[in-house]
Every structure is written in C-alpha cells, then in structure tokens.
C-alpha cells in the first residue's frame, strides 16, 4: 500500500507540472490563425493559463476593425481600431455592458479564453457556446415560459460591480478576473495537454460580443 501510494504521489506531482510552454502557445496561436485565414475570417486570438494569466494574444490583419456605424454621435472612430460591440438578450438581464461600442477585441478574446479555462475540468470541456445555452433567462434559449438556465446570470459574476468579485486582477499569479466577465459568446474553448486542463483559447472575428439568443441559427455557420 505504501509503495502504491508513493507511485500515485509521484504520478500526481508529474502530472501537476503540465503547463503551456512558450512553444505551445506559439503553436496554438499559429494553428488558430491558420484556421481563421482558411475560413476568410481574420480574428483576434488569446491564450490563457489555468488561472487566467494571459500567455499570448495575436491580432490578424483586418480583424474586427471599428465599425463607424456604431460610433456615438459626433465621434469619428479611428478606422485602425480593433473593437467589438457588446450585445445581449433584449429579454434578459442588462449586464451593464450591453450596447457598448469600441470595446477592445483583445478583451473579448481573453474573456472567452478565461471562460473556457475556468468552467472546464479534467472530465468536462466547457465551451462558451455551451455557456450561452445555460446562462440565459430561458432554457432552452428562446423557449418562452420555461425556467432560466442552470447558470443564469453567471456571465456577470466576474465584473467589477459583482458582489461575487472581491479581488481585481493585480500582480499576483491568479486566479485572474476576466476583463468582460465570464463569456457566453461562442469562440472560447479549454486547452488540454497530456489529458490535463492547462488553459483556454478565445477567438473573436465577427466584431460582436454577446450571446446566442437563438442557438439553432448558427448550425453550419461560423460565429466567433
């Protein structure tokens, strides 16, 4: 029994050391950018570790350029800005971010990556698309007179205004707060290495950030 316990302890220690290296991050970003380029969707891509530290961000040429149509009255946006516009469910809660324009797309990509890392586990990979289905005011989304999703409202739990958020993203090693709260916008996934959860990846390419109010209309379509 002692020998078995020793082997288990050694194995656990070795497995616990699995982390994303600089080489891993570079390869992940390159593969994601290659996929986005192949789809004709310039994207901004972020990679974080298990506790929300940003390990890398890559902005492809032409990704999420500011849309003058969303500019406030009297404001001429810089056409070189890379931003997203935040939208939500008109029948759901106001997150305090709804309708904001010119939010840096890097923050959206990081929020998606953090969500993929935080909500996943060794046994369950939790994407932001999955989050979108279970955080809305009806489950399934769009089905009136049904209870809210099991994680209704969790997307605002990490915002600075949240009662659940006690510490901001300071100089510590983490856990770090997601810059836009937990994300319900498709495009965030966990990252595994040798079977261990080591972080998350997030991508944004459509200039929008919100949630899927109709989870059925995205089948067969790219939406990140």
Q: Language-model segments: which ranges?
A:
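Bacterial N-terminal signal peptides
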Residues: 1-11
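Sec/Tat signal peptide C-region and signal peptidase I cleavage site
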Residues: 12-16
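Flexible, solvent-exposed loop/hinge segments and secondary-structure transition points
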Residues: 17-223
